[in-house]
Amino acid sequence: MVTLEYNANSKLITASDAVVALSTETNIDQINVLTTSLIGETNPNFTPQPNEALSKMIKGLFESGMKNLQQKKLNEALKNVSLAIEMAQRKRAPWEAFAIQLPELHFMLRSKIDLCLILGKHLEALQDLDFLLGTGLIQPDVFVRKADCLLKLRQWEEARATCERGLALAPEDMKLRALLIETARNLAEYNGE
């Protein structure tokens, strides 16, 4: 059993035991980060809400990226959307309403992924797709984008596995079925069959 000690001066907790499990240490660190952020809040009627100025700035960057997309300035659009995503991830306080942050991040990441795929930046798109799946956005269109990206990177085995995972969730999805057939054809051609 781990004994926790609270330091009234620093407002942080520490484990007093010499041997502490890594998961316990991680939890303590997360509590301390959140506590430090909350203590800095000076509003006595505090309820966790997103910072309106920051939200407006993020929204403005994203919208300027979408305007650039409409004007066919794809690289500039990708730059603005990427900056909006980075701000949403790094500049928000840890206590801000996560229920607002996650859908916002999903929406912006999808747009960034589409831009990366259009510009042929498949590796960058693949990283963002993995991040999307890691945050729990398990939808057929995410698997379609990932499988398509893997096909363009000639990662046929992984593309097949991605299609199969997507079809396990949505067996009737025609795009995933078509990608699975294309993947099987590419694998057979690669193996000389």
UniProtKB/Swiss-Prot annotation:
Gene3D superfamilies: Tetratricopeptide repeat domain. It comes from the Eukaryota. Its main location: cytoplasm. Keywords: Cytoplasm, Protein transport, Transport. The keyword Cytoplasm applies. GO terms for cellular component: endoplasmic reticulum; rough endoplasmic reticulum membrane; Sec62/Sec63 complex; translocon complex. GO terms for biological process: post-translational protein targeting to membrane, translocation. GO terms for molecular function: protein transmembrane transporter activity. SMART domains: TPR. Disulfide bonds: none annotated. The keyword Heme does not apply. It is found in: Cytoplasm. Component of the heterotetrameric Sec62/63complex composed of SEC62, SEC63, SEC71 and SEC72. The Sec62/63 complex associates with the Sec61 complex to form the Sec complex. May interact with protein YLR301W. Part of a complex consisting of KAR2, SEC63, SEC66 and SEC72. Acts as a non-essential component of the Sec62/63 complex which is involved in SRP-independent post-translational translocation across the endoplasmic reticulum (ER) and functions together with the Sec61 complex and KAR2 in a channel-forming translocon complex. A cycle of assembly and disassembly of Sec62/63 complex from SEC61 may govern the activity of the translocon. Present with 5290 molecules/cell in log phase SD medium. This is Translocation protein SEC72. The gene is SEC72.
